[in-house]
């Protein structure tokens, strides 16, 4: 990670860390790096529903226009919508203004290349290098200054594409949706209405301040109650920018990203669409996920935590399904990033094709109890290479055998070591996690 770019673009508290001045620079230098080979580059901009979106869009727009770009404003749209439309309209770049599932105070700016994929590390480094130096970029004048046009119908083009990924309608299926008062608030309602589902919605009345506030994929409790109250067949919870999906079965039980991936992987395998019989996930996926795949003869590849690492593995090795327990699920045959609405219609389509309720599909994967504990340390990297810790982890893994697992990893942002244990019972998880935590605190703690 660089000075400005993190694991998912540039993020910060809007008007403090992520200021209009910084947004202008990102537009000017980011736009230049992505479009320097084009005489009149076309760049798409989308945003979520945060109150700071207009402010940052205006500043970003000014930066892009200052390098002579033709900017197409998409208005409120999901992150995957921007990624899809960037490629579909042959634009030179796309930009999304969102902080995903973060609170309303935060915002972010994320770029996509002409292929619809996020930027490479090399591209981000080039942008940062220009931002930290003297501004010697060309400054067009007169008719060469950039122009801006609205392309609000882009959202409908994106929805039409999503519908074309399946052959069924959803007539007679009762669907409850929670849009986190975010980017999918209008889009998801239109999508499922067009597919003839019976829709009930919550979290679909954004006011600029209520995004992710008690609703959406990181707060599914209200949706669980709503599904039972409305006697719905399925609940679908999206996050603020629409790149995640967490589902709820007809009984009100959570169906997380692991279960959604398993359900879709099994169906794709049965119809011959799962490439190399493999699903890509992160090390945080539940042990039950791996065992369920193994039981039906499928393989799994593990990556570090983060959807960018899942995507790298998929692209490098030709896989077409991957994701995270948190609900980032990538169907690479269709789109170049995680997409909550695409994941949702693929999941509902499996219900339609199999005739099975979601609870029955989800119950084929048995979730192992899991405990996650954080321990503050002096040096997290030194702690992870400590022989005393490695010996204790090895001892616990031998005792667990194939009925559990241990994962010890550093926090990405704090001086913490995270200890995750999965086992057959919650009591075993607690017992083994406490053993490892005790060793860290005694020998390596802050």
From Swiss-Prot:
The lineage of its organism: Bacteria, Bacillati, Bacillota, Bacilli, Bacillales. PANTHER family: PHOSPHOGLUCOMUTASE (ALPHA-D-GLUCOSE-1,6-BISPHOSPHATE-DEPENDENT), PHOSPHOHEXOSE MUTASE. The gene is glmM. GO terms for biological process: carbohydrate metabolic process; peptidoglycan biosynthetic process; UDP-N-acetylglucosamine biosynthetic process. It comes from Oceanobacillus iheyensis (strain DSM 14371 / CIP 107618 / JCM 11309 / KCTC 3954 / HTE831). Binds 1 Mg(2+) ion per subunit. Mg(2+) binds at residues 100, 239, 241, 243. The modification Phosphoserine is found at residue 100. This is Phosphoglucosamine mutase. It holds the Pfam family PGM_PMM_II. Keywords: Isomerase, Magnesium, Metal-binding, Phosphoprotein. Its cofactor is Mg(2+). Activated by phosphorylation. It is an enzyme of class 5 (isomerase). It comes from the Bacteria.
């Amino acid at each position: 990670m660089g000075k400005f770019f993190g694991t998912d673009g540039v993020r910060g508290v809007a008007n403090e860390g992520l200021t209009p001045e910084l947004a202008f620079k990102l537009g000017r230098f980011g736009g230049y790096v992505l479009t320097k080979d084009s005489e009149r580059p076309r760049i798409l901009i989308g945003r979520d529903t945060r109150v700071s979106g207009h402010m940052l869009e205006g500043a970003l727009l000014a930066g892009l226009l200052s390098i002579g770009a033709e900017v197409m404003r998409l208005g409120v749209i999901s992150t995957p919508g921007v990624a899809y439309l960037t490629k579909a309209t042959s634009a030179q770049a796309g930009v999304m203004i969102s902080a995903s599932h973060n609170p309303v105070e935060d915002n972010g700016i994320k770029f996509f290349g002409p292929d619809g994929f996020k930027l490479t590390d090399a591209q981000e480094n080039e942008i940062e290098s220009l931002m930290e130096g003297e501004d010697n970029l060309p400054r067009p004048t007169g008719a060469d200054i950039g122009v801006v046009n609205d392309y609000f119908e882009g959202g409908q083009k994106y929805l039409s594409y999503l519908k074309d990924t399946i052959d069924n309608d959803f007539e007679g299926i009762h669907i409850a949706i929670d849009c986190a008062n975010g980017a999918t608030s209008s889009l998801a309602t239109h999508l499922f209405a067009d597919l003839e589902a019976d829709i009930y919605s919550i979290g679909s009345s954004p006011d600029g301040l209520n995004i992710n506030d008690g609703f959406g994929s990181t707060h599914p409790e209200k949706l669980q109650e709503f599904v039972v109250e409305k006697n719905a067949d399925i609940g679908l919870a999206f996050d603020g920018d629409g790149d995640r999906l967490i589902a709820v079965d007809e009984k009100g039980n959570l169906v997380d990203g692991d279960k959604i991936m398993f359900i879709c992987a099994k169906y794709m395998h049965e119809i011959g669409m799962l490439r190399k019989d493999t699903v890509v996930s992160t090390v945080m996926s539940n042990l039950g996920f791996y065992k369920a795949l193994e039981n039906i003869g499928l393989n799994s590849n593990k990556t570090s935590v983060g959807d960018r690492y899942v995507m790298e593995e998929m692209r490098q090795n030709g896989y077409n399904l991957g994701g995270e327990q948190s609900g980032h699920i990538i169907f690479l045959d269709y789109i170049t990033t995680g997409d909550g609405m695409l994941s949702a219609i693929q999941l509902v389509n499996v219900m339609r094709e199999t005739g099975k309720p979601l609870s029955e599909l989800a119950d084929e994967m048995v979730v192992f109890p899991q405990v996650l504990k954080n321990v503050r340390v002096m040096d997290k990297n030194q702690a992870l290479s400590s022989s005393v810790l490695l010996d204790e982890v090895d001892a616990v893994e031998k005792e667990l055998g194939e009925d559990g697992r241990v994962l010890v990893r550093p926090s990405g942002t704090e001086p913490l070591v995270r200890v995750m244990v999965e086992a057959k019972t919650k009591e075993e998880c607690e017992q083994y996690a406490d053993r490892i935590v005790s060793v860290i605190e005694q020998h390596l703690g802050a």
